[in-house]
Amino acid sequence: MKQTWRWYGPNDPVTLSDVRQAGATGVVTALHHIPNGEIWSVDEIEKRKATVEEAGLEWSVVESVPIHEDIKTHTGQYDLWIKNYQQTLRNLAQCGIYTVCYNFMPVLDWTRTDLEYVLPDGSKALRFDQIEFAAFELHILKRPGAEADYTAEEIAQAGQRFATMSEEDKARLTRNIIAGLPGAEEGYTLDQFRQHLATYKDIDKAKLREHFAYFLKAIIPVADEVGVRMAVHPDDPPRPILGLPRIVSTIEDMQWMVETVNSMANGFTMCTGSYGVRADNDLVDMIKQFGPRIYFTHLRSTLREENPKTFHEAAHLHGDVDMYEVVKAIVEEEHRRKAEGSDDLIPMRPDHGHQMLDDLKKKTNPGYSAIGRLKGLAEVRGVELAIKRAFFSK
């Protein structure tokens, strides 16, 4: 695997020097300062690329070129935003950047309820608490019809949890959910959030798939033409939330994508932490079935709790993800590619490290502090080395 590191640009508290010292050779970044829908110019791309290369690194993957909400709802100027997206892909290819991670999640990108969940060892992790999320949806957001998405027991527990919350607890929970997490391109006030949710009131899974298919049929031929590989990121969490449909959550969704636009430019980001939240997702089977189309990997693990819809970010080699088998399947796919004459390594980044040690004293991007990811990268690197020595050394 090609070892990479997500970097949020010049304002990231983790510097490119830190990234290089961690042992990564590639950088995963995006032009977050450009508004959603606007074209990334060659000049802006080259500026960022030069910054990365001056640090002795390579811009390996774009994460993400965000998709304008008009495209997802098929309203407004969606065709203009698609044309702009096509041009951005052409410009990236012109600059020698050929792997693009993106997602098609409505309204929100990844969602958590607690950004500072304290683990027994004192480090901090990200957590999604199903009951706290229900308390937000039922008692703060007050989304019509939300009760249908929860069991009677969850509704009762959410009411009890809400009753014990201080005003600061409610404000923090609201911020965590709607204000935008690192890498998310949108943040909302509560009223704006309600308005955005309302734009999806007539959009179910089938309709959102129609809109995604329209996007893919417009984008993938351009990507194919210029040599860009599109790598869709799964939904996080991988199930419907807030009454919104989710369409990149299962192996069946992956198969639908391939059948909809059967081009090798139409590929996947294997995010083990997102797909792995669902017990019915067999990560190794996903890699084996769609290995030739996996162009990027996010390696992390989550741990489901007593309520299986509640989970927190586990250490990279613990939790519900069998990281050994996952890495072995990825190495096997790379070995297959090499046997066919390609030295095409799959970029991997350690995802969502714990906030720990000296980083506990610093202001960090949730999930993206340096030391926790350094630890995760070192652990995964060791697993990969052991697998290669045991199974693939001559």
UniProtKB/Swiss-Prot annotation:
It is an enzyme of class 4 (lyase). GO terms for biological process: D-glucuronate catabolic process. Keywords: Iron, Lyase, Manganese. Transmembrane segments: none annotated. Its EC number is 4.2.1.8. Pathway: Carbohydrate metabolism; pentose and glucuronate interconversion. GO terms for molecular function: ferrous iron binding; manganese ion binding; mannonate dehydratase activity. InterPro entries: Man_deHydtase, Xyl_isomerase-like_sf. Its cofactor is Fe(2+); Mn(2+). It catalyses: D-mannonate = 2-dehydro-3-deoxy-D-gluconate + H2O. Belongs to the mannonate dehydratase family. PANTHER family: MANNONATE DEHYDRATASE (PTHR30387:SF2). Catalyzes the dehydration of D-mannonate. This is Mannonate dehydratase. The lineage of its organism: Bacteria, Pseudomonadati, Pseudomonadota, Gammaproteobacteria, Enterobacterales. The gene is uxuA.
